[in-house]
Amino acid sequence: MDEDEIELTPEEEKSFFDGIGADAVHMDSDQIVVEVQETVFLANSDVTVHNFVPDNPGSVIIQDVIENVLIEDVHCSHILEETDISDNVIIPEQVLNLGTAEEVSLAQFLIPDILTSGITSTSLTMPEHVLMSEAIHVSDVGHFEQVIHDSLVETEVITDPITADTSDILVADCVSEAVLDSSGMPLEQQDNDKINCEDYLMMSLDEPSKADLEGSSEVTMNAESGTDSSKLDEASPEVIKVCILKADSEVDELGETIHAVESETKNGNEAEVTDQSTSIRVPRVNIYMSASDSQKEEEDTEVIVGDEDAGGTAADTPEHEQQMDVSEIKAAFLPIAWTAAYDNNSDEIEDQNVTASALLNQDESGGLDRVPKQKSKKKKRPESKQYQSAIFVAPDGQTLRVYPCMFCGKKFKTKRFLKRHTKNHPEYLANKKYHCTECDYSTNKKISLHNHMESHKLTIKTEKTTECDDCRKNLSHAGTLCTHKTMHTEKGVNKTCKCKFCDYETAEQTLLNHHLLVVHRKKFPHICGECGKGFRHPSALKKHIRVHTGEKPYECQYCEYKSADSSNLKTHIKSKHSKEIPLKCGICLLTFSDNKEAQQHAVLHQESRTHQCSHCNHKSSNSSDLKRHIISVHTKAYPHKCDMCSKGFHRPSELKKHVATHKSKKMHQCRHCDFNSPDPFLLSHHILSAHTKNVPFKCKRCKKEFQQQCELQTHMKTHSSRKVYQCEYCEYSTKDASGFKRHVISIHTKDYPHSCDFCKKGFRRPSEKNQHIMRHHKVGLP
């Protein structure tokens, strides 16, 4: 006997029919009636179901009325031929009944030992449904019931150990019920079952410890309770129990995991059966091909063992089980379905899938491999980083893994998205042990919190040193400060800072400020205590101090603008509120909001004026005003001249005001002539206009002049080979030896080699001595 086949022995002490119920009370010696799952014998292999012709002439099509499955299942040529019928095969009879059992005499049949109590089967190699003999006539059949022997056992599929826990597998899809007669035509349905349902074929994996592993190999079934008690050999592996569930169409068994519906275009095993006489369209049914048809391509279903959703569905439904030989498992076909399961360890699931697929599609001859072999890949992952996942298997074999959130149920394609989403949940944040006191950061590791707090300390240190030394500007980050200093460097390369009182030039403003304080300190006696900047007048220093204090005493009367300088306020009013400035009369100082009112008021002054100017249309109200107008406008002579600058004025009052400016301001003397002015800008304008020739291009090093720029560029090349003189006290450098000497003496030396001939006061440069003599001793230089 093959080691995969199990020898069955009858149970003599207790009959199978002891607890069947009231339907089995009236029985005689020749009749045994059992009400079990309804099964319809459709036809032999010559029956055509909706243009469906099986390839194997010995195959039989069976319709399961209760479970709505149309199956062409096994090789019947070895079972149904009269010459091959033996005592080793149990061939029960099919009996018609709608809801109750009927007594049918079996004396007419030529199988004398069919109801013998001692019949056993040494090799029961049959599929899910037991087939009947050809000698039984079922032409007037509406619904059938199976009549089986008391020693017929429940069906169990023996498999290798897959998992230690019982887990159910959803592997079937919803189909519709249809009953076919012997000619292959559909019959009217007498049940009021739902047409659209969702039936699932449930497969569960039991532990070996649940079976009584003793010497006896008897297997019995209790038809009422639906529970089983099995006794197997000690070497027998785990058991896969197969049952079909009747699911409610309004309830989703998988919850939010997946809504899997078979496509009518992709599923090649579905067909529609139509009544030829009534032309009534019967709901679609599933047709399963025989295992001998190796030419047909069949879609495979990958079975994923779930831990949560699939495990909870098998407990609520009865189980219909059968036992078959392991060598004939290849003849049983599973419907195509989408399966989904939540798992905590995807690697163990892959191992279970490989084992289950190999057992359900075992074919030693290499004829038909329904599920491709998969190699298990075990990767050790830390338990703290495990995430719950869901696996979806499509009919074409493609799998899709998603990661659902354990708090809200949302699904994500990758673990990274799930991890980012989970961090926003308050439930996740509440589990953190360590929380940062400076921000919202939290963590479970103390070292991570320590590293995070160090980043706060570095931020505080950088905030203290983010002030620019050149312009005193506060910056937010140290990197921004470096970029800002680079801007100062670039500006210094392209721009040179020049002293307006001497020939000193430098690339940085700070060095120029230092030069002004050291060299020209006497010219700027009023120095700011905050930044060290010097001013000539205390009013200028007072205005500058407002920059540091933030004081803005000048307010705009039309808006909220404030300024520290009155000139800035005037500019603001002219640019922003030019339309709002009232019109003011130049004679009586009256103000007007409208231009028309101002013009009407001016007419009144014109009418009151009786003194007409003989040179123009000007009128005055008195003679003195008319005389002043004629002298200032129509007279070229300036009889009133200034003694200090020889500037002429029309009136003595104007000259008096001009002389006051000479007394209040210091005079700036021209180096080339006797011209002096209290305004340094006027002095610069004088030098450019009077003492500068019309030469556009001049060398800055040797002061040589050129008429064209190309000549100046050619001349500048001659200075490139000269020696560069670098000052050891500052960053000043030059290629002119005399200029370098002058720089050292004037900036970094306390000696005053040039002394005044009248007061013996010393100066660093001759120009300073000459300016002193002209200003204080009133002596012209030759």
Swiss-Prot record:
Main location: nucleus
UniProt-annotated location(s): Nucleus
Bias type Basic residues, positions: 373-382
Segments for region (Disordered): 211-233, 360-386
Comp. bias (Polar residues): 217-229
Entry annotated with the keyword Metal-binding: yes
One cellular component term from this protein's GO annotations in UniProt: nucleus
Any GO BP annotation: regulation of DNA-templated transcription
Function: Probable transcriptional activator. Binds to the consensus sequence 5'-AGGCCY-3'.
Free-text comment on this protein's domains from its UniProt entry: The binding of ZFY to DNA is mediated by the interaction of the GGCC core base pairs with zinc fingers 12 and 13.
Name of the protein this chain belongs to: Zinc finger Y-chromosomal protein 1
